[in-house]
């Protein structure tokens, strides 16, 4: 699955990079501490 970079989001010195997949059905967040979350876009 290919991911496309959406943007960088930060709040109070902590943040994540956000990506969407090629058919816009999933969103992926990669946090500064290495935590990764993938969820469905409704």
Regions found by a protein language model. Give the residues of each.
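Acidic, low-complexity, intrinsically disordered interaction modules
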Residues: 1-42
